[in-house]
Amino acid sequence: MNPAIFREYDIRGIVDQDLTDEVVRLLGQAFATYISRQGKHRVVVGRDGRLSSPRFREPLVQGMVSGGLEIVDIGVCPTPVFYFSLFHLDREGGVMITGSHNPPEFNGFKVCVGKETLFGEEIQNLRKIIEAGKFAEGKGSVSFQEVIPAYQNYILQNIHLDRRIKLVIDSGNGTAGAVAPKILRDLGCRVEDLYSKIDGRFPNHHPDPTIPENMKDLIAKVQEIGAEVGIGYDGDADRIGVVDPPGNIIWGDQLLILFAREVLRNHPGATIISEVKCSQNLYDDIARHGGRGIMWKAGHSLLKSKMKEEKALLGGEMSGHMFFADRYFGYDDAIYASCRLLEILSRTEKTLPELLGDLPKTFSTPEIRVPCPDEEKFELVEKVRESFRKEYPIVDVDGVRVLFPDGWGLVRASNTQPAIVLRFEARTPERLKEIRQLIENRIKEISK
């Protein structure tokens, strides 16, 4: 078994290379052992539309049943429907088989104990159980239950649009296609849907809305029909991408500004959490609207647990994970987030660009990934942090964000790749270039 499949936020690898039926059965046994030690036995299993997911369901369930778990199989569904089932069916945990937004040859597993997603050391504990080879034994069971209709009804009862909205959605042949078009039409929207048929080969484009290339068809259709908004979902519908009528991509931190204003209107002083990669505009706007913005570590599991700790009503990431604890359960759900966006649009005659038109103009880079071996990346970031700490104010909850009066630069170690991640923002293109050069030159000096 390749230990590298146990990642920071989930378990994932290449089908038949890292993930075999035997490895998946062991995962099922390890999960059963881990959760039984906590006195929990009633769990859920769901899966995405990847070609290998039905196959992996068999050994996963066998392993879990051999450990005495009572399983409800909810079939093919988006990841947020799996999270919803933990509340709706009142289960004590579960496993979602999903490769999320990774290429077709990948698959993976998101693991929940109680209502929480495992991350970090807890995921490594599953690996340690497999390596020790001592598994819980018992006589489990499997039953089947359809949860998608209950999920759709829940959202329809909790979302209210003031007028009909014309929009385009692109499910990227992922699982959102089985759920989102119906909800949006039942809300009264005029929906043009692209690639709603689930197909694990992803024949039209890769299901990752953070990459502009994958949004081209959505942008073209929004412009062609004159839609108010375009919404793209990733492969398992826990991340959202948004396009405005002129065809600009609204990144996660801008989207969070719209959601934050709405939440703060109803809950003055609320706490809102985002990550170190986000624009200064977001934190300034939260403060301007009377909220408490917390800059936290990147990574959806880390953000979710920080939200619980701070009793935050809203959280979000650049990557499009949006977490609503306001009127919802606090997990990342791109379908629910799109409904909340439509609520905002339905209550105004302003367009998306007009709603964001009062933000100060800034210039930023996308995330820049610089290859750096896993065994060196944390030490390098630490040295960069110590070097800048002497001269500039910094934020160091995750790597180092160096603060300037008119911009910032971020250097952090990637949680998922052998790389360091850089991002820069400034008030002018010239200043952006200067900040970037200053920080990149410092990294070069330190890594000599």
What are these regions (language model features)?
Residues 37, 42-106, 182-243:
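N-terminal small/polar loop signature for handling phosphorylated ligands or for N-terminal nucleophile
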Residues 92-100, 104-106, 222-244, 249, ...:
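Glycine-rich phosphate-binding loop
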Residues 105-225:
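Gly/Ser/Thr-enriched, mixed-charge loops and adjacent short helices
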Residues 265-423, 428-448:
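Phosphate-binding and adjacent anionic-ligand microenvironments
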Residues 71-80, 249-252, 274-275, 296:
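Active-site nucleophile and cofactor-binding loops and adjacent substrate-binding regions
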Residues 1-62, 66-68, 144-166:
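An N-terminal, well-structured beta->alpha segment
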